[in-house]
């Protein structure tokens, strides 16, 4: 847990970078600090590992006032990832990854085993990449090594200062996905600095929107997008915040339609009869193990025969392979993108066991988005009532 209590940072020239900040990051939570250059977000983060000292106020790490902790010892307890990565050019990938365990005095065998484990965790085969040097890696690979190095001593807290800002958009999205996968397993307490609202929305459990050294809003992504607290936040988030909501609204089971379902070895005529009976022009096709195979059009070619009059056609003869599907809980944005990419009127959805649970259509997508907006509006009204009650007390 990280707690800021009335923290201010004022420089000798009178510039106040952070004004009376009170903020708490819960254990296992990922909080993104977002805002334009010079707004105080990086200063806030650097005060946690004492690269910058606050002018007043307190910062607590798991209940301990960090001003009483030796700065070097403190930094060895905190993972730190920066945009420039900062790998040592004369050290191999394995040795770079093992930097903090080395400083902590771990035995060589233990730290190298830990480095190999972390490289594998971030998607770099240690047998292929461990003996390489930083200049032999791509930008995305160097960034992965930076994340592995930050995790090597298993710190409870990670500080990440625009770690994916120096790579191209495709690599950036891939790194974001990989980091979300890691966080879902490791549950670190993370302060993540970015100037990109879309990155903040995509990664953060909560978002702190900074403006001129102050937090303008500190809320979950959906609330920041759906109910900006100030005109500044509304302007920073952008006029297309309705589209951005697609990134933070998950597909839920109640959003799905249930089309006719047939199996590969069903007679084609029986499958057509089922579609007619349910008033549908298509059906989802499952294989013998009830796993998703594809789909079948009511206009499937053929006269009900396969190789001749002796064998009636089956669904298998006319089924089309499924080009797109998503797991339950995926953002609506992925579903919308998939429909556009495949020129499809729906996308199949699977559960955690890869079982088919339904399809999401454009109309159901709209209903899901509307539901999310309505829920946020109810939350805002409830908060307003609570504030009025406190004010009247």
Q: Model-flagged regions — what are they?
A:
Residues 49:
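Helix-to-loop junction immediately C-terminal to a conserved catalytic motif
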Residues 218-219, 227, 295, 359:
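ABC ATPase "signature
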Residues 132-137, 141:
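Conserved ABC ATPase signature
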Residues 212-214:
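Conserved ABC ATPase "signature" C-loop
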Residues 94-102, 112, 116, 205:
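Short helical segment in ABC ATPase nucleotide-binding domains corresponding to the A-loop/adjacent helical element
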Residues 260-281, 285-287, 303-305, 324-353, ...:
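The conserved cystathionine-beta-synthase
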Residues 152-156:
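A short, proline-enriched helix->beta-strand linker immediately N-terminal to the Walker B motif
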